[in-house]
Swiss-Prot record:
Pfam families: Peptidase_S9. One of its GO terms (biological process) is proteolysis. GO terms for molecular function: serine-type endopeptidase activity. It comes from Schizosaccharomyces pombe (strain 972 / ATCC 24843). Disulfide bonds: none annotated. This is Dipeptidyl-peptidase 5. Residues 1-19 form the signal peptide.
Length: 683
């Protein structure tokens, strides 16, 4: 056990000196502008977005709504509010709606007129508003917005009583509040003005007494519903099933004239991204066929309202789109624009609903969002490993792409590259290599191997403020971020291959990746390697710790990882996850849980390890981190435990994130110095 004095010494040396800081570091990353998705007006000549900047001097965000001109590429700030702005939605070509939180228990929908730079409140609501959809017919508008119904919340007692699951989800206890969809109506007073008046007395809760909740917790939002003047389509969990053991969500339709509700989908898995076509007759969505499997392939379905016919589009396509939007492609061909992971990038595709062709539209970087105006160009929100979110447009006829608004932080395109190396079972494994901006090929650099979570996830060419490879690279490391067996974007069979095999093929792929580093990267100092991972990546850190590969690393970092696979099932909230990946419950298939249980190999643990966990992480509870730290301390292995009391599975708050980066970088820098890695000279 380390002395208090040594702990204080570590705290003092933890902060890098100004001389040691790279031009791009954790602080500059966290203070860089954070942009929302850009939203084009119907005409396609203007876009709006929200930009936030965090100041470590003031310890607060400054947020504003900006207008981007497509022809001039100029952008200007329209609104600055200390309060939260969100849900930007154009109502005409020169006016948009947005939601603003007034306090913890109320919010407003406001209209902003771009022509005269004026705003006014359209509607006040007694809860937070998250997203807005608009439908129009003959200057009459129907607004559907998502909000929270708190009418069933019991208070002011701090006692929770439960008769069913979920007890808690992601980072909060189930208190009885529910997500729902509300409906109001507006009238446009004159044809050529942006003056609207509300024509409904109060918002109608469209899901009241249905037993349905939408958007779906914990990450549901605008993608969970769509509406026009006559219809609302949305997804919700099947109320007849246990939400903690089943992934099934259903696509529903509500007739906004009669309020009639009907279900459209029959899939046993999750459905998402319901979208209404302009003709009002066709509805598309994504659906998974496998129950209890959140990473099953998303398949595109199209439903025709008049006939009730449903068909599976592009059945041959072996990718899993995350979102879809209706639109028109070359020559006026109708279809769907889909974003899907593909070989380490998020690519925009066009999917023909008639010919079932799938055509890639973008090549570089990653697309996170698209906006589809009436013009021939789509507005894209993109990012890369070196660029925070920026905006571009792409012509659907020529596929020519141009940048509308850059977002540079001074990182060079030559600082990263992608490679492939031979993996298990004949698979080729993809990895990103990120180098310091001051890279000199004649020198040798320590190596940081990054292992992603999921496990059905991937390292894509996109920006992150949580795990940003460029931050590690510019602290002096060669970053090797690989996608082992189970990763997404390489075909569904590759993704599915990790089931029942958490510590098998993925571990071997990482071993082969380390061999690739040794044999092919002349500038990599393979004697000074560290490995870091979060969630499943944290599981893999603890698994590596108990196996031979662990001795090839000077230090390890485990963020919100798994220590005991059995306890993980019993303590988590989404039980279906372990049920799928381990082939049942622990009492049904204990042999698989035990086979891949890191706690069964603690006798072999020996490498210094930093353990990080958060108290509001209900996906992998903090007892997993404490258990790992207990073992490390009992065995006398150099170790450190970092606990965030106010964070969940992710460390989001900027000041916490800065501390996270300082702790992690100090740990791996210490153990890759020119000293005996087993010496505990700092701590």
């Amino acid at each position: 056990m380390h002395s208090l004095f040594k702990q204080l010494v570590f705290f003092l040396v933890m902060t890098l000196t100004a001389a040691d800081k790279a031009a791009f570091d954790a602080e500059s990353m966290l203070e860089a502008p954070r942009r929302s998705a850009v939203v084009s007006n119907p005409l396609g000549n203007l876009g709006i977005f929200i930009e936030s900047n965090y100041s470590f001097a003031d310890h607060k965000y400054n947020s504003g709504i900006y207008l981007l001109n497509e022809s001039t590429r100029n952008h200007q700030e329209l609104l600055v509010h200390g309060k939260s702005n969100k849900a930007l939605t154009w109502i005409t070509d020169s006016a948009f709606l947005y939601a603003r939180e007034d306090n913890s228990s109320s919010s407003s929908i406001l209209l902003f007129d771009v022509n005269n730079r004026s705003e006014r409140i359209i509607y006040n609501h007694n809860s937070s508003i998250s997203d807005i959809r608009i439908g129009e017919k003959n200057n009459h508008y129907r607004i559907v917005f998502s909000s929270v119904d708190n009418s069933l919340v019991k208070g002011p007692s701090n006692v929770h009583v439960y008769d069913h699951l979920f007890v808690r989800h992601w980072d909060r206890w189930n208190t009885g509040s529910r997500n729902t969809l509300y409906f109001i109506e507006l009238d446009k007073k004159t044809e050529n003005s942006n003056y609207f008046e509300i024509s409904s007395e109060k918002a109608i809760d469209l899901l009241k007494e249905t037993g349905l909740e939408s958007p779906v917790e914990p990450f549901g939002g605008l993608s969970d519903f769509d509406s026009n003047y006559d219809k609302l389509v949305f997804v919700a969990k099947d109320p007849k099933l246990n939400p903690a053991t089943q992934t099934k969500t259903v696509v529903y339709e509500i007739n906004l004239n009669t309020r009639n509700l009907k279900s459209l989908s029959t899939a046993k898995g999750a459905c998402s991204s319901p979208r209404l076509a302009k003709d009002g007759n066709h509805i598309a969505w994504l659906e998974m066929q496998t129950p209890q499997y959140e990473s099953d392939q998303n398949q595109i379905m199209v439903y025709e309202s008049e006939s009730g016919a449903k068909k599976h589009i592009a059945r041959h396509w072996d990718r899993s789109p995350s979102s879809i939007e209706w639109g028109v492609f070359k020559g006026g061909e109708p279809g769907l624009f889909a974003i899907a992971e593909n070989y380490g990038k998020q690519i925009l595709f066009f999917v023909s609903i008639f010919h079932h062709q799938v055509i890639p539209m973008t090549e570089e970087h990653s697309v996170s969002s698209i906006s589809v105006p009436k013009s021939s160009s789509l507005w894209l929100t993109k990012s890369s490993l070196i660029n925070p979110p920026y905006y571009a447009k792409i012509n659907v006829e020529t596929l020519n792409e141009s940048v509308l608004l850059e977002n540079n932080v001074g990182l060079s395109p030559t600082s990263y590259e992608e490679i492939w190396f031979p993996g298990t079972h004949g698979h080729r494994i993809h990895a990103w290599i990120v180098k310091p901006e001051s890279f000199d090929k004649s020198k040798k650099y320590p190596v940081a191997v990054l292992i992603h979570g999921g496990p059905q996830g991937s390292w894509t060419d996109s920006w992150s403020t949580r795990w940003n490879p460029a931050v590690f690279a510019n602290a002096g490391f060669i970053v090797f971020a690989l996608d082992p067996t189970g990763s997404t974007g390489y075909g569904q069979r590759f993704t599915d291959s990790i089931a029942l095999d958490w510590g098998g093929k993925p571990y071997k792929d990482i071993e082969l990746g380390v061999e690739y580093i040794k044999n092919h990267l002349s500038y990599a100092d393979s004697e000074k390697m560290v490995a870091l991972g979060a969630s499943y990546g944290g599981y893999m850190i603890n698994w590596i710790q108990g196996h031979p590969l662990g001795r090839q690393f000077r230090a390890l970092v485990c963020h919100d990882g798994v220590f005991n696979t059995l306890n993980t099932f019993y303590n988590t909230e989404e039980l279906y996850f372990s049920i799928h990946d381990f082939g049942g419950t622990p009492w049904e298939n204990r042999v698989i849980y035990e086979r891949w249980n890191p706690s069964n190999f603690v006798n072999y643990w020996a490498t210094p390890e930093l353990v990080i966990h958060s108290s509001k992480d209900y996906r992998l509870t903090e007892s997993e981190g404490i258990a790992a730290f207990n073992v490390l301390q009992y065995k006398g292995i150099p170790s450190r435990l970092l606990v965030f009391e106010d964070e969940n599975h992710w460390v989001i708050k900027p000041d916490n994130s800065l501390r996270w980066h300082k702790e992690v970088l100090s740990w791996i820098l210490h153990y890759t110095k020119d000293c005996n890695a087993n010496e505990d000279e700092t701590f």
